[in-house]
From Swiss-Prot:
Protein purpose: Required for vesicular transport between the endoplasmic reticulum and the Golgi apparatus.
Source organism per UniProt: Coprinopsis cinerea (strain Okayama-7 / 130 / ATCC MYA-4618 / FGSC 9003) (Inky cap fungus)
Membrane topology listed for this record: Peripheral membrane protein
Family matches, as InterPro entries: NSF_attach, TPR-like_helical_dom_sf
Sequence intervals crossing the membrane: none
Primary location recorded for the protein, binned into one broad class: membrane
Protein name: Vesicular-fusion protein SEC17
GO annotation, biological process: intracellular protein transport; SNARE complex disassembly
Family: Belongs to the SNAP family.
Keyword Ribonucleoprotein: no
Any GO CC annotation of this UniProt entry: vacuolar membrane
GO MF annotations in UniProt: soluble NSF attachment protein activity; syntaxin binding
Location of this chain's protein in the cell: Membrane
Length: 289
């Protein structure tokens, strides 16, 4: 039988302390404090041994001990340490630990830090579990918390990320609402005004993907009313050419507009995907040969 590692020995010592009845002269709090300290030591030892699941479990036990002592700040930090360990291959457990962290942060009024952790959850959903719908929800929550803390630029990035994902999920009305929201905020600053044309282009592409050319044209005019320089941009001219081609059911004109735009501004994966969807919609129109 292999000898116990130092980390395992510490973990068992912590378990023994947590399960003890305590002595005549010791308080319940001191028992949980000592057990929490031992779990923390065990967790760090597991990390040195690169046993990240075990490290996360030990940090989670530490967090529970801190909670029993009503030490919310320390409990939140322990849950976050658990999440960082779980992120090394255990995304579902990492999400659960981050959610616990957020509860403590919100209870303490630390919404900026709560937003940071919620954004981490969104990225795990996106990159590890590939659950785009839940990633959208987490990006939105993070964005709302950032907005409440006047971190407008970071909030807008979260809303934009959510909009991109909603479009991938073909939930275009939600995407349009968010792109317009980010554009409205961006118009208020000279530092971010330049990016507005990109948000409006994406919004128009989503509207065209819905097959609603009338609303797309109405929205384009609304955007020009908000910033009359938009009409002279490549983004507007591209969207306008696409609307004309889709309205006419002209696949050739549509393809030519896409090729011309891509020649100067390389299409990213998001635009390529939605443009292919729109093209398929033209080809599937009844009576089109």
């Amino acid at each position: 039988m292999a000898p116990k590692s130092a980390a395992q020995a510490l973990f068992e010592k912590a378990d023994k302390k947590a399960n003890s009845s305590g002595g005549w002269f010791s308080s319940a709090n001191s028992k949980w404090e000592e057990a929490g300290d031992l779990y923390q030591q065990a967790a760090n030892a597991f990390k040195l041994e690169k046993q990240f699941k075990e490290a996360g479990d030990a940090f989670a036990r530490e967090a529970e001990c801190r909670e029993k002592c009503k030490e919310s700040l320390d409990a939140g930090n322990a849950w976050w340490n658990a999440a960082k360990a779980y992120k090394r291959g255990y995304p579902d457990l990492a999400i659960q630990a981050l959610q616990q962290t957020i509860q403590h942060l919100v209870a303490g009024g630390r919404f900026r830090q709560a937003a940071d952790r919620e954004k981490e959850i969104a990225q795990i959903y996106l990159q590890e579990t590939h659950d785009l719908s839940r990633a959208c929800e987490s990006f939105l929550r993070a964005g709302d918390w950032y907005a409440e803390e006047d971190a407008t630029a970071t909030a807008n990035q979260c809303y934009k990320d959510a909009a991109d994902l909603y479009a991938e999920l073909e939930q275009f009305p939600q995407a349009i609402t968010l792109y317009e929201r980010v554009a409205d905020h961006s118009l208020t600053s000279n530092l971010t005004k330049y990016s507005v044309k990109e948000y409006w282009l994406k919004s128009l592409l989503c509207t065209v993907a819905l097959g609603d050319i009338v609303t797309a044209r109405r929205n384009a005019q609304k955007y020009i009313g908000q910033d009359n320089t938009f009409v002279g941009t490549r983004e507007f001219k591209f969207a306008d050419a696409l609307m004309e081609a889709v309205d006419a059911g002209d696949v050739g004109a549509y393809t030519a507009a896409v090729v011309e735009f891509d020649r100067i501004t390389k299409l990213d994966n998001w635009k390529t995907a939605i443009l292919l969807k729109i093209k398929r919609g033209i080809q599937e129109e009844p009576g089109l040969t």
